Amino acid sequence: MQRKPSQKSATDKLFNHRVNEKITGVSRVRLVSDDGVAIVSFEEALRKAKEENLDLVEVSADQELHVCKIIDYGKYKFELLKKSKEAKKKQHVINVKEIKIRPRIESHDYEIKKKHAQEFLGKGDKVKVSLRFRGREMMHSDLGMKVVYRMIEDLKEHGTAERDPIQDGKQIVVIINPK
């Protein structure tokens, strides 16, 4: 029976630094501290960190000399976690909201649908306007196109149509992007 590879969580990926004695295979490091930047032996850097009751954290292992900092690792992890949560909060996922209308829509119903579309566009979401035909209404697809173009025109100050409306079988569809 084979063992499953472990799944790393988001926090594990964020904190992939080697700390103190876990930094191996290094004889000299570029040490960043309050005193400035210096190239010292690994043992000396570790000794300085222990004297200050702090941790020696490997920040970058990409260069010839590994870059290490003398910091409080617990506090550093907390700050990184806080920054990542703050960045995640600021992200906005764009959703596509759908507004369904009919070719013979009453004016009040049309205004309500338009108001909802404006709210969605104001929140930064895309709006998919779909007009559905029933039965013999398909014979008058030009009426449906007029309603859809009217909706696009009325929402012009809130968003722009991705492309011209497309008739797809028994419906006309257009997607409006927020400004």
Swiss-Prot record:
<dbReference type="InterPro" id="IPR019813">
    <property type="entry name" value="Translation_initiation_fac3_CS"/>
</dbReference>
<comment type="function">
    <text>IF-3 binds to the 30S ribosomal subunit and shifts the equilibrium between 70S ribosomes and their 50S and 30S subunits in favor of the free subunits, thus enhancing the availability of 30S subunits on which protein synthesis initiation begins.</text>
</comment>
<protein>
    <recommendedName>
        <fullName>Translation initiation factor IF-3</fullName>
    </recommendedName>
</protein>
<dbReference type="InterPro" id="IPR019814">
    <property type="entry name" value="Translation_initiation_fac_3_N"/>
</dbReference>
<dbReference type="Pfam" id="PF05198">
    <property type="entry name" value="IF3_N"/>
</dbReference>
<dbReference type="GO" id="GO:0005829">
    <property type="term" value="C:cytosol"/>
</dbReference>
<comment type="subunit">
    <text>Monomer.</text>
</comment>
<dbReference type="InterPro" id="IPR001288">
    <property type="entry name" value="Translation_initiation_fac_3"/>
</dbReference>
<dbReference type="Pfam" id="PF00707">
    <property type="entry name" value="IF3_C"/>
</dbReference>
<dbReference type="GO" id="GO:0043022">
    <property type="term" value="F:ribosome binding"/>
</dbReference>
<keyword id="KW-0396">Initiation factor</keyword>
<dbReference type="InterPro" id="IPR036787">
    <property type="entry name" value="T_IF-3_N_sf"/>
</dbReference>
<dbReference type="InterPro" id="IPR019815">
    <property type="entry name" value="Translation_initiation_fac_3_C"/>
</dbReference>
<keyword id="KW-0963">Cytoplasm</keyword>
<dbReference type="InterPro" id="IPR036788">
    <property type="entry name" value="T_IF-3_C_sf"/>
</dbReference>
<comment type="similarity">
    <text>Belongs to the IF-3 family.</text>
</comment>
<keyword id="KW-0648">Protein biosynthesis</keyword>
<dbReference type="GO" id="GO:0003743">
    <property type="term" value="F:translation initiation factor activity"/>
</dbReference>
<dbReference type="GO" id="GO:0016020">
    <property type="term" value="C:membrane"/>
</dbReference>
<dbReference type="GO" id="GO:0032790">
    <property type="term" value="P:ribosome disassembly"/>
</dbReference>
